[in-house]
Amino acid sequence: MENNVLEQVYGKNVFNDEVMQAKLPKDVYKSWKKTLENGEDLDVDIANVVAHAMKEWALEHGATHYTHWFQPMTGVTAEKHDSFLSPASKSRPVLEFSGKELIKGEPDASSFPSGGIRATFEARGYTAWDCTSPAFLKEDAAGVTLCIPTAFCSYTGEALDKKTPLLRSMEAISKQAVRIMKLFGYDDVKKVSCSVGPEQEYFLVDREKYLQRKDLIFSGRTLFGAPAPKGQELDDHYFGTIKERIASFMKDLNEELWKLGILAKTQHNEVAPAQHEMAPIFTTANISTDHNQLVMEIMKKVAKRHGMECLLHEKPFAGVNGSGKHNNWSIVTDTGINLLDPGKKPHENTKFLLFLAAVIKAVDENAELLRLSASNPGNDHRLGANEAPPAIISIFLGEQLE
């Protein structure tokens, strides 16, 4: 690719605000933004115009299908592809995409995990457009597909995914934080957002060697074996010089992520041999979560192109560090105030101290729920032992705040 690749490719496969402003009539764009900012119901007429613009943009980029892209309780994403084709009376089929098709989908929910909250005879499930997370184009062997981020629920409204609880929690935090800000006299604050920047640690191994290990293939980790002759005893792999083969992978990975508007910022060797890390710039929590799912999917695809396998299991090898998603979480007002920023005089910053105390109280009273959210077989293999963090919930404030 030519020089200045970042500027050339960044966001090219995303139906972002800049594209919407260019594709939509001014009055429709203003109405859309108002709906988004105020959290109001989307007018059907506006939805039809947005859907048409989205379809035309996707067709310009070679798309033939669209999908409601959602995150069931499987740990990975799900999608069902529908083409833009609609039957015409006598002539050739026409290409259509309506506001109704944009807003709501109807995948079968019968075979997705539900935790027992969905009645077995109610097989129908619904996807609902998360209009706060931009649509994007996915390029693969199937061609180009327009992916619309959505929430997923049952026929009777129970959440069957991981996004719906996240959106609800973001709304709950916004509602209470706005209430507190008004008590401090910040009447101009209308919304408070959570921001997250989750890093992604991973291992890269030669694909030929990977295919010789059935335990890695079927479980994502080694179940038996001998320790490596050289592990991480010298800490010389951490931040070490990146090898050419890995650097080539990272270059391709960055370009794929930038196309999707993912702010891939930092890359380096991690502690364990063959372990590496990619860290993005933070963004709104639900968008950041969508991005992390895409990061993991793209890492695996790009690794195969380079004759490698990307291992995302939290503890693929015994005796060396595992992989995590350390992140920086914060809450920010729509006027740009970081509510967890202590400032130069934190002991005098009443607003900061109040929100900090609220976070401490929430962690203290809901430690079990927080621990449960990170409890799965892979993570439980990783937590504790010689690694940080331990398998308990704790808060470290630093000497000044303590």
Annotate each PLM feature.
Residues M1-Y29, G125-W129, P134-C147:
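Catalytic pocket of metal/acid-base enzymes, prominently hydrolases
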Residues Q8-A123:
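Active-site core of metal-dependent hydrolases
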Residues R124-L312, F317-E402:
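Glycine-rich, acidic/polar active-site loops that bind/position phosphate-bearing ligands
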